[in-house]
Amino acid sequence: MFTAFLIKYAEIGVKGKNRYLFEDALVKQIKYALKKCDGEYAVRKTDGRIYVDAVSEFDYDETVAALQKVFGISGICPVVYVEDEGFEKLGERVVRYIDEVYPDKNKTFKVAARRARKNYPLNSMEINVEMGGVILDAYPQMHVDVHKPDILLNIEVRDKIYIYSEIIPGPGGMPVGTGGKAMLLLSGGIDSPVAGWMIAKRGVKIDAVYFHAPPYTSERAKQKVVDLARKVAAYTGPIYLHIINFTDIQLYIYDKCPHDELTIIMRRYMMRIAEQIARQTDCIGLVTGESIGQVASQTMQSLVATNEVCELPVYRPLIAFDKMDIVDISEKIDTYETSILPYEDCCTIFVAKHPVTKPNVNIIRRHEQNLSEKIDEMVQTALDTDELVIVQA
């Protein structure tokens, strides 16, 4: 029975004079998401509301699922609407709505009207009273409960009169692209895809970089990362994934540096490379999946040592999350099962038995000097052989 949806948003509604920019961005993201659905849709913005109208045959569940992946949407309301043909016609449509949507009439209800069009002959309270009376006349077994009703029937008087009672949760956040652009360090683990999803939820467009170490990491490990990027891209739109061959750099560091510092020094070079790619692609920050104390390279001292090599800000959305909190989100966004596939990435291959947990930055710098100019040549080679994959859901 539903052929239209009212799109609710939260934070966008409190924006000031630039609110229209966020609304326009949300409309753009909705149109992009619906391209993957069977059917044709008209997306329109009017009177501070966004509406999606199906203009052909469409799959209801598929459409809702697509809209639930659009950041900026807080709620999706399947609506029916009537032209303003008089109060009697509205009452007939409300009764038919109750009949079609709620087969069990042994329920409580409340009518919540909102009159945005001020020339409508009844005010909001009068609409509530009149429509409540119409429903009770049609279904005497129903009862009014203004505090905790089973059915909250919304009636909005705008260009048309919209009727809805269900609000399907959206992902919230802000439309992708309204918060700048950042480079995600994406591995095959649980954390980094979640970090990318979370920063994108705040409106940040993400590209990604993955450090590959053949033959120590397999093609299946690389494909796993591409698959994870595709899962995240279902929410963010296309992700430009940069695949960097890190093998020679890792082996050289392994040969020249103390093994208890391997992880930190390798991590510092990953950050250096990621920052260079970020600058080349107009990203204004880096994003990682680090969480304080989760592993040796994620103590506060280790994060200080990692940050030191970056001029761009490093965003860590998961910094205070427990592991199970991260797992819960990964299951929600459908990355968990892919993340736990048993294909190792370069961070798990070259791991010291007893990694330093409180690295001294001065000592780390001194050991990096032992790498001479050769490491700079390796870094440049890695950048020159960057494999770019455009990942789409």
What is each stretch, according to the model?
Residues M1-M183, P193-I239, D248, Q280, ...:
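RNA-binding accessory domains that recognize and position tRNA/RNA substrates
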Residues G48, I244-I249, S291-I292, E344-A352:
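A glycine-rich phosphate-binding loop feature that marks nucleotide/adenosyl-phosphate handling sites
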Residues G133-I135, G172-G179, Q250-L251, D255-I333, ...:
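Active-site adenylate/phosphate-handling loop in enzymes that bind or generate adenylated species
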Residues L184, A208-Y210, I243, T288, ...:
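Structural beta-sheet core signal
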Residues G189:
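Conserved G/P- and acidic residue-centered "switch" motifs that form tight phosphate/ATP-binding loops
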Residues A233-A234, P238-E261:
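S-adenosyl-L-methionine
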Residues E337, L341-A393:
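The feature marks non-catalytic terminal segments
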